[in-house]
Swiss-Prot record:
Its main location: periplasm. One of its GO terms (cellular component) is bacterial-type flagellum basal body, distal rod, P ring. The gene is flgI. Transmembrane segments: none annotated. This is Flagellar P-ring protein.
Length: 348
């Protein structure tokens, strides 16, 4: 298995983005909904008799329809207990449709071909905000037996829920509106304040900290008109240098300009020596790894003399050496701990 490296030309570059892309409007957000339900119509791929909660749920459902049956008498494998989730968008109105996600709770083999029965979706306050029902769609299933496909124990119901209860909003009555930066940064917050005060020709924006910008709506604008104009403004910003590592998939995402300082590091049987001031000629039996790297196969030492050694260079060379993904990830983490990488390292 080789590690997958994705390099993005982000670090040390100045970009422009709209305020809408950089911020959230405080109070204007999605709300999570959850419910417990049953999927029926499965072709023998549902929960087995060991999932007692499924049998009890079937019994309870049938009793609600005046059909009395004991859970111990139910032998159906065409039903599965599932958890149903959805997001209730800001300003959603009664009758609006929502997409829902469905995931098996028991030991069902597959939800393919199933139908979700009427399921109440509740918020964190315990109130019912939507009701879901409909046929399940499982995307990406392989048509060939034995071929890899997606997880067949999770599915979606497109437009499968109907909003029954609205969340009260006071957006149009708010005198002050708050923007929250998705990535806290003093410079970006200051840029937003400066641009908005210039556009509106008055002090309507005040950066309170590295994330929060307070807005005061001018009387001549409605709330909707004001926010529409605010959110469309372009702001110059510099993305934070970051290296993201996904340990599960062996993926490293890094800006192409993220440099690594001179260092000597040994991991297992691999030694990496970064010394841009020491020009090393290709010796006997040594291998040119490109990217400014030379491999001594005897000592298994990778000597890097490139004036600008980057995370991308090192990852590529280690890949060529056949290093395991977990070894490459460990080396990156140790480089960060040693202070050779100044960018933020995020492991997911």
């Amino acid at each position: 298995m080789r590690i997958f490296l994705l390099c993005l030309a982000l670090s040390l570059s100045v970009f422009a983005a709209t305020i809408k892309e950089l911020t959230n409007v405080v109070g204007v957000r999605d709300n999570q909904l959850i419910g417990y339900g049953l999927v029926v119509g499965l072709n023998g791929s549902g929960d087995g008799t060991s999932s007692e909660f499924t049998l009890q749920s079937i019994s309870n459902m049938l009793q609600g329809m005046n059909v009395k049956v004991s859970p111990g008498d139910i032998k159906s494998k065409n039903t599965a207990a599932v958890m149903v989730t959805a997001k209730l968008p800001a300003f959603a109105r009664s009758g609006d449709k929502l997409d829902v996600s469905v995931a098996s709770l028991g030991d069902a083999k597959s939800l393919q071909g199933g139908t979700l029965l009427m399921t109440a979706l509740k918020g964190v306050d315990g109130e019912i905000y939507a009701v879901a029902q409909g046929s399940l769609a499982i995307g990406g299933l392989s048509p060939r037996p034995g071929a890899a496909g997606t997880h067949s124990t999770s599915a979606n119901v497109i437009n499968g829920a109907v909003v029954e209860r609205e969340i009260p909003q006071n957006f149009s009555q708010s005198e002050d509106l708050i923007l929250s930066l998705k990535e806290a940064d003093f410079k970006t917050a200051n840029n937003i304040e400066r641009v908005l005060n210039t556009i509106f020709d008055t002090d309507i924006a005040k950066a309170l900290d590295s994330r929060t910008i307070k807005l005061t709506k001018p009387e001549e604008f409605s709330h909707v008109e004001f926010m529409a104009r605010v959110l469309e403004q372009d702001i110059a910003y510099t993305p934070e240098s970051k290296v993201i590592i996904d340990e599960r998939t062996g993926t490293i995402v890094a800006g192409v300009n993220i440099e690594v300082e001179p260092i000597l590091i040994t991991h297992k049987d691999i030694t990496i020596k970064i010394d841009p001031n020491n020009t090393v000629a290709l010796g006997q039996n040594e291998i040119d790894m490109k990217d400014g790297g030379i491999l001594d196969p005897v000592s298994n030492t990778l000597k890097i003399t490139n004036n600008k050694t980057t995370v991308a260079n090192i990852a590529r060379m280690l890949n060529k050496l056949g290093a395991a993904p977990n070894d490459i990830i460990a080396i990156m983490q140790n480089l960060k701990r040693a202070g050779a990488i100044s960018a933020e390292l995020e492991v997911i």
